[in-house]
From Swiss-Prot:
This is Autotransporter adhesin/invasin TibA. Its main location: membrane. Residues 110-123, 136-146 have a biased composition (Polar residues). Residues 629-638 have a biased composition (Pro residues). Glycosylated by TibC. Glycosylation is required for adhesion to and invasion of host cells. Glycosylation is dispensable for bacterial autoaggregation and biofilm formation. It comes from Escherichia coli O78:H11 (strain H10407 / ETEC). GO terms for cellular component: cell outer membrane. Sequence repeats lie at residues 82-100, 101-119, 120-138, 139-157, 158-176, 177-195, 196-214, 215-233, 234-251, 252-270, 271-289, 290-308, 639-643, 644-648, 649-653, 654-658, 659-663, 664-668, 669-673, 674-678. Residues 110-146, 623-686 are annotated as: Disordered. It is found in: Cell outer membrane.
Length: 989
């Protein structure tokens, strides 16, 4: 480089000094230089030849508008406090140095080839280029300023402030840079940085070909390593973060609050995660040889991978079964591959998610660890939960052993199912939702388990000193039994229910409005055949209900056996069948206690056992079911289906209305002798099922006779309305009949129906004959005195003939067939619904004769006599509670005599005949047989005399059309009909 020097006299030193032609400040002024030109030339001639001397520049300003736009420093040249403005350039090379240079917008400082720059300040728009052996030390890069280090250049101690940038590229290097908030350091294409400190808000970008070593990331400082970039020995402190986007990192140390994020294509090797630090691996990210110390955390997302992981005690792994993870922990080797996790250790924030179709085997869930099993995920081997370890998931399938270790205080809400087992050793757990473990539940070492609003199906094995609590509506189905140490205690409260699935043993059982159910529930697998179940207790206290089963027919049933004291109040809700006991009246024990003041009562007060009802009896400290033996009372007269005892004077008296009361042979097997004598011996009370059968056996007779009664009014006025050549008629009828019966078999029969027919009338010499056919239908609702509502659907038809003459005589005959479709509905004493459907055929008829007399011009009288007969065929029926009944042929034979008094009026030109009627009827049938369970015979006696009273009116609207209406009241030994009504019409051809 060509340089021009001046030789000037320095008065202060008394010597000649060689200076650059650019020197002004601090030297002689230009006019003084001109005065010494001659002296200089002389000196040049006189002095010997010598090399050029180094130049020193202080406080120079270069750039556009200045005397000089550039400054070149080399070979020992120095410059201090230089200001480089827009367009100005300073070149520092070959031993030149610049100190405290200020580079403003548009200014450039080039440091290369052995040049050096110290303490430069790069402001907005200013640039410093360090290359080819140049070096820059302690540079400050401010907002908008840029330092570029490349091609062998180096920078040390650069401070990059907010908005400033440092680029280290193409063989450049930077050491000990400090990147502050908002500042950036870019490293790429062979650039190397070391010991960079990235502070709050600062950013370091390591790109393709760049490398960063010993970087320290402080609060919110970030290091971004993209594809082809590498970072080594990075230290990540609290709030700092390293992001690997295809780049690689080795030897990273992550401290409390620090984070490393490894994304797609990124890799990290030999990372150490200290307490509070976290390494996060995303899809297609890969880490290897990560060491997790106590309190540190490795999180691997689905599609990410981590290998050769060292999980120290207290270290946490957060991952799922769609990741690939392997390494060692306190329990040995662990791995996740192909949707299968093996030997995972989850503690101190560790979390494993098992996805649908995936599985986890031999998982250890420690304090603050979580195992999350999604629907379709499966647990195998031994899954262990300790301390505050948690199992979560909407649907968890356990095919292994789910083991809650001592001191576990875990809670579970969701569905836990599978063929595995659940073991709790010590601790206090709580389960809600749904639980089903085919392998059973094992409660050990003083453990306490609470089932809170849980639907559970599992057999439970307890040890002495353990406690199982059912609370808040829990339903448990399964056996509970002890082991060789004894049986644990149990509490059933808060409307909870325990369904026993077989014989069970409990230490101390406490009921707090809970229910223990011996019956098979919808979730059990018990066979339809009855199997008695026993519950053995050490002691019993509280209040609640025991729902039990008995089969008195085979003299067997469930047993509650309390070895110690029993105290409190308990209800026995006992179900039995309609089957007949082999040995009638033998007591059946249902409760045994070792002592105490416990009180047991029978729900409903009774239990059905085939034909008879049984009650609860106490003997010493034990309780038995025994056949009732109360005295008989008067039968009911006002049954009510909605309240079986309403209007029933024998309510609370179990044998009221028993026709065999006082008859020792009545109802005995095979006697068939209901009237074998009298006795003062107490009798048993029939069940509601028997009473319903007895009542339904008589219903066809009452239905048929009611229809036949209404049929006799088909003509209205037989002589006036029945005219040749004939006609058609129709009639609606409705009635409400209260029917008493033996053995409390009374009922209310409500009938609604119609009849319609047609006939032809033949005129004889002094009389007429009507011959016709008809069809009838009625719906008959039966409300049993002791509860239940049955129905008889009756349809039929027949033939009739009526003869009458001009003197007022008439004879009327009817033949009728009926089909009865019977639906029996009642319930047992325990509330179990009972039903049985069957059909019967019935045949019958009536014959009536009478005469109409004129009392005066308008009044008339019509006496008559009438007889009816009916027979329904016998029927074998079976109820759904197992009861059988043989209904014999039901017969009815009645005779009736009556009188109608009326008058004939002319109303608006129409003939109207109001009338009153009275009659007395007697039923002769008193021996209709019914046999129950092939054992007990009953006699339905429907005989008795009945008074009938009515009023009606016939109106002849036209010569060929008439209408009529009638209302009647009936009262007799067996029946009372407060009102029976009918309306009809006839049209003659």
């Amino acid at each position: 480089m060509n340089k021009v020097y001046n030789t000037v006299w320095n008065e202060s030193t008394g010597t000649w000094v060689v200076t650059s032609e650019l020197t002004r400040k601090g030297g002689l002024r230009p006019r003084q230089i001109k005065r010494t030109v001659l002296a200089g030339l002389i000196a040049g001639l006189l002095m010997p030849s010598m090399p050029a001397l180094a130049a020193a520049y202080d406080n120079q300003t270069i750039g556009r508008g200045e005397t000089s736009k550039s400054m070149h420093l080399s070979a020992g040249d120095t410059a201090k406090n230089t200001t480089i403005n827009s367009g100005g350039k300073q070149y520092v090379s070959s031993g030149g140095s610049a100190t405290s240079t200020t580079i403003n917008i548009g200014g450039v400082q080039h440091v290369s080839s052995g040049g050096s720059a110290t303490s430069s300040t790069i402001n907005s728009g200013g640039h410093q280029h360090v290359s080819s052996g140049g070096s820059a030390t302690n540079t400050t890069v401010n907002n908008g300023g840029r330092q570029t280090v490349f091609s062998g250049g180096s920078a040390m101690g650069t401070i990059i402030n907010s908005g400033g940038d440092q680029y280290v590229i193409s063989g450049g290097s930077a050491t000990s840079a400090s990147v502050t908030s908002g500042a950036r350091q870019f490293v790429s294409s062979g650039g190397i940085v070391k010991a960079t400190s990235v502070n709050s808000g600062g950013r370091q970008y390591v790109r393709d070909g760049g490398s960063a070593t010993d970087t320290v990331l402080n609060n919110t400082g970030r290091q971004f390593v993209s594809s082809g970039g590498s970072a080594a020995k990075t230290t990540i402190n609290s709030g700092g973060g390293m992001y690997l986007y295809g780049g690689s990192a080795t030897g990273t140390s992550i401290y409390n609050g620090g984070r490393q994020y490894v994304s797609s294509g990124g890799s990290a090797t030999n990372t150490t995660v200290y307490s509070g630090g976290r390494q996060h691996v995303y899809i297609d990210g890969n880490v290897t040889e990560t060491t997790i110390t106590s309190g540190g955390m490795l999180q691997v997302e689905a599609g990410g991978s981590a290998s050769k992981v060292i999980q120290n005690s207290g270290g946490a792994v957060i991952t799922n079964t769609s990741a690939a993870v392997s390494g060692t922990n306190d329990n040995g080797s662990f791995s996740i591959a192909g949707g299968s996790a093996v030997n995972m250790l989850l503690e101190n924030g560790g979390y494993l998610t098992v996805f649908d179709g995936h599985q986890a085997s031999d998982t250890m869930v420690g304090s603050d660890g979580t195992l999350d099993v999604r629907s379709g995920g499966v647990l195998y081997g031994t899954t262990t939960l300790t301390d505050k370890g948690a199992l979560v998931g909407d649907v968890v399938t356990n095919e292994g052993n789910l083991y809650y270790l001592n001191n576990s205080t875990a809670t579970f809400t969701g569905t836990l199912t599978g063929t595995g087992t659940l073991t709790q050793e010590g601790g206090n757990t709580r389960f809600s939702g749904l639980l089903s473990q085919d392998g059973g539940i094992f409660l050990q070492s003083g453990g306490a388990m609470t089932m809170d609003a849980l639907q559970a199906k599992a057999n439970v094995t307890t040890q002495s000193g353990t406690t199982l609590t059912l609370d808040n509506g829990t339903i448990l189905t399964g056996n509970v039994a002890g082991d060789s140490t004894g049986a644990g205690d149990m509490a059933v409260k808060g409307a909870s229910v325990w369904h026993l699935d077989g014989d069970s043993t409990v230490g101390a059982l406490t009921l707090d409005n809970g229910t223990v159910d011996f019956r098979p529930s919808t979730t059990t697998r018990m066979t339809p055949a009855f199997q008695a179940v026993s519950l053995a207790l050490g002691s019993l206290s509280g209040s609640g209900t025991f729902q039990m089963n008995t089969d008195i027919a085979s003299h067997t049933g469930d047993m509650l056996n309390v070895a110690g004291n029993a105290s409190g109040n308990f209800v026995l809700d006992i179900k039995n069948t309609g089957l007949e006991p082999v040995s009638a009246g033998a007591p059946l024990q249902v409760v045994q206690t070792g002592g105490g003041d416990a009180a047991f009562t029978l729900k409903g007060g009774k239990v059905d056992a085939g034909t008879w009802e049984y009650g609860l009896s106490k003997e010493n400290t034990n309780w038995y079911l025994k056949a009732d033996t109360p005295p008989p009372v008067t039968p009911p007269t006002n049954p009510d289906a909605d309240n079986p005892d309403a209007g029933n004077p024998d309510a609370g008296n179990p044998d009221a209305g028993n026709p065999d009361a006082g008859n020792p042979d009545a109802g005995k097997p095979g006697t068939g002798k209901p009237d074998a004598g009298t006795s003062s011996s107490p009798v048993r009370r029939t069940t509601k099922s028997v009473d319903a059968v007895l009542g339904m056996a008589t219903a066809p007779a009452y239905v048929f006779n009611s229809e036949l009664d209404n049929l006799r009014f088909r003509h209205g006025d037989v002589m006036q309305n029945t005219r040749a050549p004939g006609g058609v008629w129709g009639r609606y009828t409705g009635s409400d009949n209260r029917i008493s019966g033996g053995a409390s078999s009374g009922y209310t029969l409500t009938q609604n129906g119609f009849e319609t027919g047609a006939d032809m009338v033949f005129d004889l010499s002094d009389s007429s004959l009507a011959v016709g056919t008809f069809f009838s239908y009625s719906d008959n609702s039966i409300k049993h005195a002791r509860g239940g509502k049955s129905n008889v659907d009756s349809s039929g038809g027949g033939l009739y003939a009526t003869w009458f003459d001009n003197d007022g005589y008439y004879v009327d005959g009817v033949l009728k067939y009926n089909r009865f479709n019977n639906e029996l509905r009642t319930w047992m004493s325990d509330g179990t619904a009972v039903k049985g459907d069957y059909s019967q055929n019935g045949f019958g008829g009536s014959l009536e004769a009478g005469r109409t007399f004129s009392l005066n011009e308008n009044a008339w009288a019509q006496p008559y006599v009438r007889t009816t007969a009916f027979r329904a065929d016998k029927k074998e029926i079976r109820l759904n509670n197992g009861m059988k009944a043989s209904i014999g042929a039901t017969k009815s034979l009645q005779a009736e005599a009556g009188l109608k008094l009326g008058m004939t009026l002319d109303v608006a030109g129409k003939e109207v005949k109001p009338y009153l009627s009275a009659a007395v009827s007697h039923e002769f049938s008193d021996n209709n047989k019914v046999r129950i369970n092939d054992t007990y015979d009953f006699r339905n006696d429907i005989s008795g005399t009945t008074g009938k009273y009515g009023l009606g009116v016939n109106a002849q609207l036209t010569p060929n059309a008439g209408v009529w209406a009638e209302a009647r009241y009936e009262n007799g030994k067996q029946t009372e009909s407060p009102i029976t009504g009918g309306v009809g019409f006839r049209i003659n051809f």
